[in-house]
Structure formats: C-alpha cells, structure tokens
Amino acid sequence: IKDILGILLLMLFLMLLVLFAPDLLGDPDNYTPANPLNTPPHIKPEWYFLFAYAILRSIPNKLGGVLALVSSILILILMPFLHTSKQRSMMFRPFSQCLFWILVADLLTLTWIGGQPVEYPFIIIGQLASVLYFFIILVLMPITSTIENNLLKW
C-alpha cells in the first residue's frame, strides 16, 4: 500500500508539472524566433553524442565532417575486432590500462568541446582531441596489444 501511495504521489507531482508549468524546466533559448538560413548556436545533440558532434565540427569540410562523425561511431562498433591481444583482461596489461584512461579523458574532452560554442580555442582543442581519438583507437591500441603479446611471450 505504501509503495502505491508513493507512486501515486510521484505521478501527481509529474502531472502537475506537465499540466500547469510545462516551461518550468525548459530552455528559454527555444523561444527565440527561428532563422531558416542558419542553425541557432544553442542547438546541440544529446550529451551521449556530443563527442561525435565535436568531431563533426572539427573538420571544416561538410562531407569530411559527416564521414568523420559516422566513422567515430562505427569505430566503437568495430572495437572488438581491433583487439588483437591474446589476453582478454587488462589486469596484467599496464600499457593498455594507461591507453584506456587516456581514451576516456579524450572522450570526456570531446564531449565537453561538443557543448561549447564554435570559437577559437575550442576549435583547436576539438581538432587535436579528434586526431587523438582516431590515433589511439586505430594506431596505438593494436601496437600496444602486439607489444604486450611479445612481452608476455604469447
């Protein structure tokens, strides 16, 4: 009974919020008049695609940016096939651990840059982080796996 009461109170609160104050949690930038010739600066994707959006914006060419965006997402799908190490766990592979945390820091940087405006320092940081993203996944991870295989005599 007390669980049903809690659910009903939560539903009541949400219904009151939606019906009587729908703009309370909204963004005021959404009410500016639209110009169909350009994208407003406050438009950005959800937080989980901001890293790909930063990669898209880091390339000045539109086609190149779209190809980089698609490849940045597809590369995450292909990641298991790029894993060439004989040992599956990273517990005894310190180079791979370090590389993993560098990749996490790079993804966090790209996510932060994706939410920033297109201005001078953010453009350069986004370009460097984009190059580092592809370099880590396509070059450093396979090389590190090969080195660790040789060190472990697999």
Curated annotation (Swiss-Prot):
Component of the ubiquinol-cytochrome c reductase complex (complex III or cytochrome b-c1 complex) that is part of the mitochondrial respiratory chain. The b-c1 complex mediates electron transfer from ubiquinol to cytochrome c. Contributes to the generation of a proton gradient across the mitochondrial membrane that is then used for ATP synthesis. CDD domains: cytochrome_b_C. One of its GO terms (biological process) is mitochondrial electron transport, ubiquinol to cytochrome c. The gene is MT-CYB. It is found in: Mitochondrion inner membrane. The chain crosses the membrane at residues 1-21, 63-83, 95-115, 122-142. The cytochrome bc1 complex contains 11 subunits: 3 respiratory subunits (MT-CYB, CYC1 and UQCRFS1), 2 core proteins (UQCRC1 and UQCRC2) and 6 low-molecular weight proteins (UQCRH/QCR6, UQCRB/QCR7, UQCRQ/QCR8, UQCR10/QCR9, UQCR11/QCR10 and a cleavage product of UQCRFS1). This cytochrome bc1 complex then forms a dimer. Binds 2 heme groups non-covalently. Belongs to the cytochrome b family. Keywords: Electron transport, Heme, Iron, Membrane, Metal-binding, Mitochondrion, Mitochondrion inner membrane, Respiratory chain, Transmembrane, Transmembrane helix, Transport, Ubiquinone. The keyword Phosphoprotein does not apply. The keyword Heme applies. One of its GO terms (molecular function) is ubiquinol-cytochrome-c reductase activity. Heme 1 (or BL or b562) is low-potential and absorbs at about 562 nm, and heme 2 (or BH or b566) is high-potential and absorbs at about 566 nm. InterPro entries: Cyt_b/b6_C (IPR005798), Cyt_b/b6_C_sf (IPR036150), Cytb/b6-like_sf (IPR027387), Cytochrome_b_C_euk/bac (IPR048260). It is a multi-pass membrane protein. Its cofactor is heme. Pfam families: Cytochrom_B_C (PF00032). One of its GO terms (cellular component) is mitochondrial inner membrane. It comes from Cervus nippon pseudaxis (Vietnamese sika deer). Coiled coil: none annotated. It comes from the Eukaryota. This is Cytochrome b. Signal peptide: none annotated.
